[in-house]
Amino acid sequence: MNDACRKTAGFKISILGRTYALRVSSLPIADGEKIVMRILDEGNHALTLQQLGYWGHSLATIEEAILQPHGVILVTGPTGSGKSTSLLSLLSILNSSAVNISTVEDPVEYKIPGVNQTQVNVKAGMTFAGGLRALLRQDPNIIMVGEIRDTETADLAVQAALTGHLVFSTLHTNNAATALPRLLEMGIEPFLIASTARAIIGQRLVRRLCPTCRKAYEPSADEMKEISTAFHLDQPGVMKRLHELEQKAASQHIGDSIGAALGSTETGIKTLYKAGENGCDKCNKTGYKGRMGIYEVLENSPAVQKMIVANATSTDIQNQAISEGMDSMQVDGLVKALRGETSIEETLRVTRE
């Protein structure tokens, strides 16, 4: 699409035998032309959920949800939070010759062998809603709609779930629980949301600390006070929950132990990690190498269903989910910071509202 104000384009290049798709957007500014490029490695294969950073309650909940024969599973977060990558992994788990998986995407970022992928083309009348309506006549078992942007698409997704399809899609919301009032705002009846939603993922991306040059340190009293406030460590049960997560991670042999980083349930945190001041050759002197996800997965339990029908607030629903075992994105980020996989600063950067 081109006009006087902006230009967007896409093309492919090959570097050292690997093919990359580039999406380029330019905008005229006072100093010239501002360009943003999104680079997609077409040789990338879907990562496992564990490789993406799912574990514990989040992993168990989403693995159970995707085995349901019908319903809606949503992935939420801002632009650039890894939603498409999560969807790619989820669809790849389910992909087999025994099921018909069809998608409507804008654009098709990663091609999945054996999956029928359709690209949105507004000029040709192929919108998300129009594409979804067409897919329903193609006898699909599993449907993925790139994004629910309007009431029509939301309604069609719910109706598809009611008629025996497993539907995946995304929403731009701050966390998992706020996806529910967003659907209500789109005009979906509470009882329909309660009966079709299976699980809602909230996620963010954080930079991964370089394992070669990261530095362990003991937080000062002032820093500990700030961390305690930001992560609500002074609230009843929070430190106890961190110790429970440490025991669970140790039993499942997940990541580095956080036991050494934790004091007693009363004393708080003993050890944290930060990026090396000048980085190293392994991370191009940045202190960080790659990115990883932090997640929360809200299960639509019977109690949550009743709250949806009763028009409960997203805060109340979030608290109910946490009481049932869900760990918030902040807690997941904190655990990964205690393991030395990311930093406290990174977790706060992406989870502060």
Question: Where are the regions that the model predicts?
Answer:
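Short, flexible helix-loop junctions that flank or precede catalytic/ligand sites
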Residues: M1-E353
